[in-house]
Amino acid sequence: MNKIVLVTTKGCEGCNIMHKSIKQALECTSKKIEYVTKDVMELTKEEKSKLKTYDFPTTLFYKNDRITRREVGTRPYIVVVRWIDVDFK
């Protein structure tokens, strides 16, 4: 299963921008991809360490329950479209 997880934090404008970029990118693809946003406060200390979420927004791409991409910061939607094409062939 293909999945994108956006880890955010309260008051993060970059997180809002990345959320919009991901939503727009998902509208440009016909691939079946689950999209989830998580606030960092929902994660345990162990999850934060395992996912290496030290800065925000952190975008994680999963394919078959394995992380295939970890990106920090904001990107335009067209870059996210490219990531989808590369990671979810």
Residue ranges, per PLM feature:
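Local sequence-structure signature of Cys/Sec-based thiol-disulfide redox active-site neighborhoods
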Residues: 1-28
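Thiol-based oxidoreductase modules, predominantly thioredoxin-like and allied folds used
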Residues: 7-9, 19, 31-45
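Nucleotide phosphate-binding site architecture
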Residues: 13, 41, 68
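Structural motif
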Residues: 28, 48-51
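Structured loop/turn residues at beta-strand edges in well-structured enzyme cores
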Residues: 31, 54, 66
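Structural micro-motif
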Residues: 50-60
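Non-catalytic, surface beta->alpha helical segment in thiol-disulfide oxidoreductase systems
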Residues: 60-89
